[in-house]
């Protein structure tokens, strides 16, 4: 009879131990950098965690499970980890579980890319975008009405059958208590990433990201920000992008999905800042740059190397809105004109811009003489306050009619169609799943 109390105690101990390991998972897991044969799994664990691993297997072959351990440091105040799984099979659905101290704390799945080149038509796919995710924190927010809105929009996004999410900057908002130290910046990333409303979304699909001023540092932060290198390290720790700039500078990178190449730009690390004058002595100011020479050289070469039908350039600030008095590429006139003139001279078809920042969504059409039009698809905000266009932007002649959305929303973007007529369809969707605006462009219409 003494066995029964012992068994009960053993069961209670086992449940308590498993619960403790669950608490050691702070946020995640999420995947990123999905490729044909590898993927990155990201998570954050508590300071009490001693060991982290990922166990994974093809869904149809659970007997072929493998494990990969995290070999980096643990036991710090914040412990984001990234584990790369290698030698996977292309076009395969995998199940995986995150193990903390040998206990399974969360399960999810990922699908490796299909090897379609020279074998089959480019696969159709859908992805989500969004920017400006402000999460309220009492005591550290601005006094008065909370700036952050309903964050249940992420629950709606979780239900989307999307292939990945592309975050377009201001993915969290640093506050005055965060700006002035590396630990402050790390706290903001850690705290906002760990919110319960985000966890299902993080695991639902792969994630890629760029930053803008508020997750880089203070409002309108530029290369003058003294913690820009520390901020870069935090961004690297919290996002599973494939790479982060070049020569240990910046966070720009590139990835591909089906027949689309994505060029993720860094508009902060190298930026002169919006407060530097556009002109000096009546001439465009050559010192004012948003991206810097090295990044622009990389972008030009990367675009020339691309054979993708759509070439998506993602950047935090609007690229083509010449009517905006806020952060926009045209306020950096020498760099802007140099790039736009280059685009006019070379034959690079299929360019589309994805941008955020503005606290409203819209599509800008930029017509060019003797060349195809450029489009700037702006999506904002996810949860921050909204802001309607003002001044010359109210009746902007370059805004595509029916695309202005001034409320919390995200983008659902589908690339589809036969190989000789690929299309990109954009929908702006609110937190209830209602479509508020639409836009579609054909790859065949993005040719010189």
Regions found by a protein language model. Give the residues of each.
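Bacterial Sec-dependent N-terminal signal peptides
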Residues: 1-24
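Metal-dependent phosphoester/phosphodiester hydrolase catalytic core
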Residues: 21-448
